[in-house]
Amino acid sequence: MSSYQSEFNADEQAAIDKEFTRLANNKSIYLDHAGTTLYAESQVTAAAEQLQRDVICNPHTCRVTGDYVDQVRFKVLEFFNTKEDDYHVIFTANATAALSLVAENFDFGRQGNFHYCQENHTSVLGMRERVQARAMYMLKEEEITGMASLPSAANGVDGSSPGDNSLVTFSAQCNFSGYKIPLAAIAGIQKQGLAHGLGKRVSGEAPQTTDNNNYYVCLDAASFVATNPLDLQRYRPDYVCISFYKIFGYPTGVGALLVSRRGAEAFRKKRNFFGGGTINYAYPHAMDHQLREVFHQRYEDGTLPFLSIVGLLEGFRTLGRLVPRRSDVATMERISRHVHGLAQYLEKQLRQLKYPNGQPLIELYNRVGYEERHRQGGIVAFNVRTDAGPFVGFGEIACVAALQGILLRTGCFCNIGACQRYLGLDETMMDAIYKRAGRICGDYYDLIDGQPTGAVRVSFGYMTRRQDVDELLKMLQLSYLATKPQQRLQLIEEQAGELPKALKERAQRLRPQLLQLAIYPVKSCAAFKIKEGGGGGGAGAGRTWPLTAQGLQYDREWMIVDMNGMAVTQKRCSELCLIRPLIRDDQLVLHFGDSPAGVSLPLSLADQAENSSRCRSKVCRQPVEGLDCGDEVALWLSQHLGLEGLRLLRQSSQRSASNGVRQQQKLSLVNQAQFLLVNRSSVRSLQFEESLDETVDRFRANIIIDTGSAFEELSYKQLTIGQVQFQVEGPCQRCDMICINQRTGERSPETLTTISRLQSGKMRFGIYISRISTENNKEQQHLTCGDVVVVT
């Protein structure tokens, strides 16, 4: 194990441990300090004793309460190394409310712009709904970081010049990755503004010029100040937004907006709303009122959460007592060193976790590494991969962690911009995740077509121990490096009752599921697809499709033959893939490409037989008997495929399996087995430039599933999908048919060569399966998209 040097001596560590015995009592390991840190037990005891001892009432009634509030205001300024001559302290509900206050009251003038960092908390994006700027721009993190290197980026500015005002908002520390934007950028922005062309305009009109604009900085410091010192004598943002529960753990419901003297000048002189305590007077009979002269009093609407504010005093005292200044290193500096040391230790250990085949277990999300504390905080974000490379969903990690008492965070952490940046999500992928797939913030839909929609985050506080980090590492080692996927999923299912409600729902989706059914009514033509969200009517209903003795109802029941009675396949005519079937209203309708015109056939075999002649052909050297479907469809096929003498034949009698497959199996016009199953994880490993759906289509499978590991289906012997049992007949040996793009008919040879490389020269992809004969087979059985796949 890599070395780790503790920041705290033995006595200090013992005192800290004594304050958090509830963790051991509840068998919990807490690793989400970026969400909130934990309160010390003596802290809340002292706060409760004060409430029992003192009379603390409405500050408008009781001067003592007002004095307490003023003490807290002074402690806040002292905590950030500033004084009331330089900054005002406005108490708010939280950092989000502080950001909202800035958005509502900042005076942009006519030409002012709103700029914000992509890697920001959702609340910063919410500011866009309230700011009255001419235009809004999204900045990359490096565009803001670049302002720190300007020669003028020194101690900021004290005032402003005539002109309009632009506002730049960014986080001091990214709550997703822990990356710290250099605070020297504050002065660079204030003095130099932003160069023309920086950022992506997302709203409004581009101003004619911003040369005369004053630039102000709003610093979202909620994540940063929880474990780092913020020196407002050295760095002077115009607005600082914080939440105290992230620093002390208790109380919740109180934050603050710190406003510099310069920042106060850029606030509007008139508010859109005022509450009690913010005015000198207000007439009910006329539109006349006057705001308070004291700046912070103008914006603290209504009665302050005075009990919570008074409780902050014990938070300051507890933090200073448990992590005292030592050798001229202040409390928050020591906490910063402690959490960074833990993050650095964890990052090194995670990089060493590998599967026996050498595949790394962990994908880390970080900008600059963990060597420099001034650039990286006590946060580690990552995802887990399988031994074949695909990602494991963060919801599964959350389940595994919860069952072992490890509390961590998963998702995007209310920072969709950071998710977009670190996960490499372009605009098309964002739409696929949030609009088409329907993911919402806070859910556990963690993988969409193998692409992670979020990550796992662990973060540290002053009470986090190295042993806690080691328990996380142990969990990852035992659950992923030393346990097979099926064993892990079984364990989660067995203990799912112990999970929180949201994770119980995610645990139910850990097993592989039936994602899609593909029915190929006409052999070698396109598929009629049944998938999550709806099918196509006809025999199927929504996501469900019936089974027959031969397989999926109507699958490969028709085939096209030439004038010699020989089956026409894509090997001879690749344009067959452009014949697209639709099953509805007791009709099979065939279309060519995107043409709305088509030709219809009855689904009823009895109706077909009345007006059809019998004919014979062969499938895989086996004779088949069928019914000729008539001249109309024959002419339509010849016209669209450019081949004369084509006929459409419908199977009229059953055929049995041969060529190594069990003799009792009844077949349609398929080549070898009743069903062909393909695993999207295996398809994903091919990594073609085309969309995953296009590649899946190449393999012309009936049953499409998605599992945790690529090619694991090749080891299956039997499986159950929903209530239907299947026997694996063997792997599908591929030919050059899979080189045909099923949406265009174009050929590309790399499909075969890639499979050959991945399978050590073998052309295997997908597996043949057949339904096992049981008593249930005597009744109509169905497959439904969403059915759980259980390997037995």
Swiss-Prot record:
Catalysed conversion reaction: Mo-molybdopterin + L-cysteine + AH2 = thio-Mo-molybdopterin + L-alanine + A + H2O
Molecular-function GO term, any one: molybdenum cofactor sulfurtransferase activity
Biological processes, Gene Ontology terms: Mo-molybdopterin cofactor biosynthetic process; molybdopterin cofactor metabolic process
EC number(s) given by UniProt: 2.8.1.9
Pathway: Cofactor biosynthesis; molybdopterin biosynthesis
Coiled-coil regions listed in the entry: none
Residues found modified as Phosphoserine: S748
Catalytic-site annotation from UniProt: C414
Keyword ATP-binding belongs to the record: no
Positions bearing N6-(pyridoxal phosphate)lysine: K246
Cofactor: pyridoxal 5'-phosphate
Alphabetized UniProt keyword annotations: Molybdenum cofactor biosynthesis, Phosphoprotein, Pyridoxal phosphate, Transferase
MOSC domain ranges (all copies): 646-792
Signal peptide coordinates: none
Family: Belongs to the class-V pyridoxal-phosphate-dependent aminotransferase family. MOCOS subfamily.
Protein name (record): Molybdenum cofactor sulfurase
Organism field: Drosophila pseudoobscura pseudoobscura
Name of the gene encoding the protein in the UniProt record: mal
